[in-house]
Amino acid sequence: MANINMADTAPSCDTYLLFNGETLLPNGVRAFIYTVVLAYCFIGLSAISGRFFKSMESIMRHSREVVTIDPHTNATIVKHEKVWNYTIADVALLAFGTSFPQISLATIDAIRNLGQLTAGGLGPGTLVGSAAFDLFPIHAVCVVMPRAGSKKKISDLGVWLVELFWSFWAYIWLYIILEVWTPRVITLWEALLTVLQYGLLLLHAYAQDKRWPYVSIPLARGDRPEDWVPTEDASVDYDDNYDGIGDILPGQNEDIVDIFSARSYSNEGYHHVSEKDVEESPTGLTLKNKWEDTHWFSIWWQQFVDAATLESSVSRKMDSTCLSVIGISWNLIIAPWKMLFAFIPPYEIAHGWIAFICSLIFISGIAYGVTKITDQISCVTGVSPYVIAFTALAAGTSWPDLVASKIAAERQITADSAIANITCSNSVNIYVGIGVPWLVDTMYNYLFVYKKPLYIDNAAGLSFSLLVFFATSFGCITVLVLRRVILGAELGGPRMWAWATSVYFMILWVVFVVLSSLRISGVI
């Protein structure tokens, strides 16, 4: 692997990051401290992803009032229609939002690199590594999420094929501009074309969803939920005097999940709107949320109360003392993050948009801290920043992707959103996550500094990682297709085959990481 030299300290390592006396500590101790802090930042990303996901659900519930006149009776018909399209929600909100840690990290790295002729290495390395993490470990988790024996398949195969095409084309395009068009150089036009292709992805996915002629694949759509928001596996009871805590009904068997999941179903300010909370008028056309009169300030205050509560209702219901202690300990560890994120306004305000934007701002702040910590780890250990980027950073910043896909795989009746989040996130990583930072750097260089393109310092290593990714991803997609043909679904099925598929996906990820690391280290 990479050459690690604890004895040598680069000049930049003389600056402290956490406290004044840290530069006097041995490099090994400093590396350990920075690694712990980095892991804690990833826990923060995991925690904020829960708030992000809930705010996104609130945005998706937003509907508009449509008034029509019955041509036969001249009666006025009032009904509510969803504002967001199902597919656009997957491509835009879900994929873009869960990829925001990688995007913000790459953008911050580019801004720090302004005025340089060579691009920063953290952004591209993280995004390619994140693509591998999204495709392999997240698929490995999702395939075992459905309950034993149950199956979940993609209902709209045409949309998935469109998203898969743009996902693979994104990395083919990246290889073309790195090795074929202008080898190891990024021009302003290449960066601009990269960003514009995200708009083409949105348009093509929407066209496929609407089955526009000539530009869509003529495949029938299977059954899928009318509402994008995942349905609950079990209802959640509330009383009229809301206290901020929803109790999970007995028999759900989610003790472990609720301890370690970033998005607990019990409290922490996330209030479910189950199907029975949505009432239908006698005409069957008007929806009413029974919580619409809840005062937002009391809900916001409840977020701080929940953040200060170490023992949740789930922990109190656990029969095992050990699990209860683990739950309390975990809540104690994440208490600072919970208290900080309690300042995010409730998602009930402005249909969740304020909470959505605030969540992205917090994610950007954590991503900036991650870049600084990574610089110090690379400095005191001698490990290549690129190796750190596509391993530790890629896994850590992809955690919101994992949480979102896991929740979708558990709660939705189809596999569309769980798998679409993976393929769309990989597309967003290139078109936005790499395109925008490179566009910022190339525009600055062309307009203000050198009048020259942007050079890629480690283009050979990046290109090799892309080739390995292509080879391993082909093996992944082939297995998903075989599961659909033989077992009838991409996710779930017999537990033995589900776990075998999961292990296979993890092996593919290990192969990618090992080969890419050996290439960067000069071993191969």
UniProtKB/Swiss-Prot annotation:
A GO biological process held by the record: transmembrane transport
Keywords for this protein: Ion transport, Membrane, Transmembrane, Transmembrane helix, Transport, Vacuole
Keyword set includes Transmembrane helix: yes
InterPro entries named among the record's database cross-references: CaCA (IPR051171), NaCa_Exmemb (IPR004837), NCX_ion-bd_dom_sf (IPR044880)
Listed transmembrane segments: 28-48, 88-108, 125-145, 157-177, 185-205, 325-345, 349-369, 377-397, 430-450, 462-482, 496-516
GO cellular component entries: membrane; vacuolar membrane
Pfam families noted in UniProt: Na_Ca_ex
Topology versus the membrane: Multi-pass membrane protein
Locations listed in the record: Vacuole membrane
Summary of the function given for this chain in its UniProt record: Vacuolar transporter that exchanges protons with Mg(2+), Zn(2+) and Fe(2+) ions. May control the partitioning of Mg(2+) and Zn(2+) between plant organs.
Family stated for the protein in its record: Belongs to the Ca(2+):cation antiporter (CaCA) (TC 2.A.19) family. MHX subfamily.
Protein name: Magnesium/proton exchanger 2
Organism: Oryza sativa subsp. japonica
Upper classification of the organism: Eukaryota, Viridiplantae, Streptophyta, Embryophyta, Tracheophyta
Gene: MHX2
